[in-house]
Each structure stands twice: as C-alpha cells, then as structure tokens.
Amino acid sequence: LKKKRKIYDLVILCLGRESEHYKKIFKGKSIKKDYNEVAITCHIKHNLKINAASQYFYEEGPLAILPFKNSFFSLVWSVSNNFFEKNNLNIRSIIEKKLKTILKTTSKIKISNVKSFPIYLRLSKKYHKQNCLILGEGLHTIHPIAGQGFNLILRDIKKLKELIKKNIDLGLNIKNSFVLKNFYNSRNAENTIFGVGVDITNSFFKKNKHFDRTKFALLDNIVKYKNFKKITKYISDKGFF
C-alpha cells in the first residue's frame, strides 16, 4: 500500500533543544552563548515547611529551590564544567550537605531523579517556516538562574492559543494565515529581552573579588524598597507585554 501524504493546517515541533529537524527546516540564525556550565537538577522529599521559591548564591554557582507540592521541591544548581567533572560521583552527598546547611536541619531528606545538562543561551531569530512552528526549548534556551525558561514557554503557548482561537472564531483558516507571523511579532521581543536580561543577571552574580562588596551593598539597598519584590514577581509571572 502506498503511504498517503498527510496535509496539516499547522505543524508544531516540540522536540527538545537539540533536534536535527530544526536545522533541516529552519536555517535562520540565532543568538548563542556557551556558559561552560552544567545544570544539576533533582527532586527533594522532605518534612519541612517550604512554600516559596528561593535562590542561593554560592561560589560554585547559584542554587534554586522550587516547591511544586507538599513535602517536595525541585532543585536546580548551576556549576562550572570543571566543578561537575571533579565532583560528579559525589554530587548527591554534596547536595545533601548544602541543603542541610541552607534549611538548617538535621532531618533526613530524600534526593531522587538527579539529572544534569549543559547550560547555554540560544535565542532563535526564526520561529516558523510556512505552516511549521518551533515551540519550547527549541525556540529559546536560557540560563536557569532566574527560573524563567519554563515561564517563557507557557507564555508562548498562551499567546499561540489566543491567536488560533481568534482565527477560528472569525471563521478563518489557520494555514496560510497570519497566525504564525503574529505569534513571532508578539513573542520575539519579550523572549529576547528575557534571554539577554537573564544572561546579564548571571554575569552580575558571578564571583568577582573587585566588585562583590559594591554588588552586595547595592542589593541590600534595593531589597529595602517594598515595591521591588512586587514588580519583579509580576514580571516573572506575567512578562513585559
């Protein structure tokens, strides 16, 4: 039997950040930067009261705690390639020691689902070709220091849904419409601003003996402003636009 060729109004590629299909279909340039770092992620089970996300800045790199349900949180720790290569075999015990210091506890914590992946910045300048769209990490990969990568993806999905619904409500086809062009125009600016902004934030928090005292004095003054946390939280949750 001959295979029938299937034609779709819209094809969305969510194939992770390293798929070869992107290079075959989309030949646009992108903003790239290799941080020479590794992100270590894992799940932590505990019996403590942890309700809010928090970030800690260590000499090895920033460590984030992200609660996702009762008695569980995700951990994301960004470290240099050299540190990871030297300590990979003992990383569980190192994480446990760090957490007990951070949480000021001697209680038992369970570490599971430990993973690692290279950290780099990549912001695609081309989002679509004809009726084919990239979505997810293939579109933008940013440093995990601010925990904004997943939020950007969620906002991309929300905007795409709105544009598709608008076309359908007007009785218009999705194929050969302006849906993907409008998606690019509405999301590219924010994705680029966040990606570059997070890159600058990461550079700011890098250890620098000549700048550290001034840097932390500046941070101490900033956090005194009551509206500062409100503004940063709003931007993190809702975006700029």
Residue ranges and their predicted role:
Residues 8-9, 130:
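Short, well-ordered alpha-helix to beta-strand connector turns
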Residues 87-168, 174-178:
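FAD/FMN-dependent oxidoreductases across multiple families
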Residues 162-241:
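C-terminal helical "tail/cap" subdomain of flavin- and related membrane-associated enzymes
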